[in-house]
């Protein structure tokens, strides 16, 4: 808008200049405002008569004009062949005073007239081609920017459409995945139930093979019960565990109370001291070597120490001055005769053993969860 206004001002100035130059009796002279004042003072103002005045534009537009001219002078040195001090004084005065065009009438009406124009306005006319070119470039840029905006709008609409389609696809895939995962979980549970039923059916078939043979055996009910229990342990459920008191009562049913009580006491005592050996018989050497033995009183328990060394079990022992530390893997130097020291050591060890067992359970649960996740993603 500024360039358009300046271009219109320059065109109006050109028209006035051309109109004045067409008249043969008039001549145009460009002067600065200071020279015009000195000329009036020197002649006394008698011969110089002001017939017409050409007012300057508004102060705001005039300041903008001055700023454009000063910028152009910085960019193109030598474009204006005027003195810097003269132009600055002219600009300062021109903002406050109008540009005066005068006609000098010394003789009659047919004598030639001179018209004085401000030097700044005369030089501002030279900027018309620059304004024209700049307006053309600005219009070209606007056209290019409009094209770019149209292209950007088209690409933006395409992106939004593709984004909507992708969102719909994502929702569909999530819904399908949820349906598939639910079906998979149901089928997995059904498969586990089917496996359990198959195992039970196989174990029942194994048991039924031996039942016809038991029919013809001349045995009592107690013996039959024991044989069926043995078959149940070996073929149906090997992990089945029975309380020992129930077994004692079944075997001592038909004996007197006195004999039953004495035998039961003997069996309980034997179970107390040698019950762990039965479980050790079912374990491998690797499983035994993973266990740990805590021994207090090495001299009294040398047999246990030798057995642990044969089986490869690690030994934690409270070692006193009368003990041999060579037979021990992990030494705990303390008094093995005092009750308080033994109680403190065993209490601390128990707390950390239980903590380790809890941590092992948590780690095993996490490992199972990760395996289940891997299996799901594999399918």
From Swiss-Prot:
It holds the Pfam family Ribosomal_S2. SUPFAM superfamilies: Ribosomal protein S2. Keywords: Chloroplast, Plastid, Ribonucleoprotein, Ribosomal protein. One of its GO terms (molecular function) is structural constituent of ribosome. HAMAP family: Ribosomal_uS2_B. CDD domains: RPS2 (cd01425). The lineage of its organism: Eukaryota, Viridiplantae, Chlorophyta, core chlorophytes, Chlorophyceae. Residues 1-94 are annotated as: N-terminal extension. Residues 83-106 are annotated as: Disordered. GO terms for cellular component: chloroplast; mitochondrial small ribosomal subunit. One of its GO terms (biological process) is translation. NCBIfam families: rpsB_bact (TIGR01011). The gene is rps2-2. Belongs to the universal ribosomal protein uS2 family. This is Small ribosomal subunit protein uS2cy.
């Amino acid at each position: 808008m500024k360039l358009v206004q300046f271009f219109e001002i320059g065109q109006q100035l050109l028209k006035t200049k051309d109109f004045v130059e067409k008249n043969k009796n008039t001549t145009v002279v460009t002067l600065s405002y200071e020279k015009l004042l000195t000329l009036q003072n020197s002649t006394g103002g008698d011969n110089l008569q002001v017939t017409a005045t050409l007012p300057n534009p508004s102060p705001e537009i005039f300041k903008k004009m001055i700023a454009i001219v000063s910028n152009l002078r910085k960019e193109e040195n030598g474009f204006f062949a005027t003195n810097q001090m003269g132009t600055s004084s002219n600009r300062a005065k021109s903002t406050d005073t109008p540009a005066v065009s005068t006609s000098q009438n010394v003789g009659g009406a047919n004598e030639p007239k001179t018209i004085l124009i401000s030097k700044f306005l005369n030089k501002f006319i030279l900027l018309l081609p620059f304004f024209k070119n700049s307006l053309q470039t600005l219009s070209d840029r606007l056209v290019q920017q409009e094209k770019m905006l149209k292209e950007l709008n088209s690409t933006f609409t395409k992106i939004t459409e593709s984004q909507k389609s992708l969102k719909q696809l994502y929702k569909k895939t999530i819904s399908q995945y949820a349906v598939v995962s639910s079906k998979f979980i149901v089928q997995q549970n059904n498969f586990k139930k089917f496996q359990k039923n198959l195992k039970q059916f196989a174990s029942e078939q194994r048991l039924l093979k031996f039942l016809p043979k038991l029919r013809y055996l001349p045995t009592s009910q107690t013996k039959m019960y024991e044989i069926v229990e043995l078959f149940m342990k070996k073929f149906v459920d090997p992990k089945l565990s029975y309380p020992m008191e129930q077994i004692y009562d079944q075997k001592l049913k038909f004996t007197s109370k006195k004999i039953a009580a004495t035998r039961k006491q003997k069996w309980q005592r034997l179970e107390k001291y040698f019950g762990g050996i039965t479980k050790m018989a079912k374990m491998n050497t690797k499983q035994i070597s993973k266990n740990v033995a805590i021994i207090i009183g090495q001299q009294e328990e040398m047999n246990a120490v030798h057995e642990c060394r044969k089986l490869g079990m690690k030994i934690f022992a409270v070692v006193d001055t009368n003990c041999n530390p060579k037979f021990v893997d992990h030494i705990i130097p303390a008094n093995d005769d005092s009750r308080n020291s033994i109680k403190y050591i065993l209490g601390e060890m128990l707390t950390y053993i239980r903590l380790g067992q809890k941590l092992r359970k948590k780690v095993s649960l996490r490992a199972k969860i990760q395996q289940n996740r891997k299996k799901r993603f594999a399918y």
